[in-house]
Amino acid sequence: MGLWIQNFKQALRGLRHQGWQAVVSVVGLAVSIVCLTFSVNWLWTETHYDSFRPGYKDLYVVEREDSLEHTESLLYRWGDRVSSVLGEEAMVGMYRYQGGRERVYLPDRPETVFYAQELSASTEMVALLGCRVLSGSLEEVAAADNRIVLTETMARKLFGRIDVCGESVCHIQKWRQLLYTVGAVVEDCRGKSNLHYDFISPLWVEDYERNSAVHENFRIMVRTSRPERTESELSRVDIKDSYPMGKLVLTPLRMFHKMGDGSGFVRAYFYQLAFVAVSLLLVLSAVVNLLAVYTSIFLGRIREYALRRSLGA
């Protein structure tokens, strides 16, 4: 027993002399773990946009797909068809394509202009997004066609407070000036989003757009907990009059920035997945190297111990 303890102490002394190998191995393992943590976090972030919205995994963008094209730009009349076909299966909302930021200001302070991102959407769309109302109500917004919804930050920029329902706001939209009344204030977009907005304006539809077969200015979003079933139901929506070979499909809002062009998951997230795979290999190799170093040191001492025993030491 005394000889075994003596050789164990010798092994520890050997470890001290070969400590640089152990240190390098530990540092390598630590670096590989950091890389793995970063890569997993990167992949999670890129696949979970709009995670601040309640039930964000149930939000899907409706897209048209055929052999030539994959797009989210749809005809207005398809929105009514989607809503009619899905019924109680899913919540349906419509919104326009978003352009750049536009100018807003208060009627009594035209010299103070703010640039803000507009979302022109139906009232159903606001409810579908799960916006938490801080002031006012969505019922007030739905009751009139000139009510807008401000985010908390936008309300504070314009008025310095959030209890601003009934106040007026001017919006300069391209060649025209619009006067709105604030109907509600909702929480901000608190993170990365595929549908960022500073204020939500009414979805006004021009007469030529309602039954148009060429003005694809609208987008449709649905909230459903059963996407496979909902997508199957979308096959019943008649779009053959405009696209005989087309069909409607669902793309998760949280991954729309990567998969909105029709790309599959692996193709869309190739770099993130590759980085995770490389990081896993680094961790595995670092663990193997660490075990090899420590095993080599202690096995050397064990062989020395066995040799001493065989020589009768």
Model-derived features: positions:
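Structural preference for long, well-ordered alpha-helical segments in enzyme cores
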Residues: 11, 30, 42, 78, ...
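Structured, solvent-exposed hinge/loop segments at the ends of secondary-structure elements
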Residues: 36-165, 170-178
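Intracellular coupling helices
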Residues: 6-16, 20, 24, 288-313
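Alpha-helical transmembrane segments of integral membrane proteins
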Residues: 21-35, 272-292
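Conserved structural-core and active-site-/substrate-pathway-adjacent residues in large, well-folded domains
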Residues: 15, 82, 126, 151, ...
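Short, strongly hydrophobic transmembrane alpha-helices
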Residues: 10, 14-46, 57
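Membrane-helix entry/capping segments
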Residues: 1-8, 12-17, 21, 235-281, ...
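Mid-to-C-terminal secondary-structure elements
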Residues: 121-137, 146-266
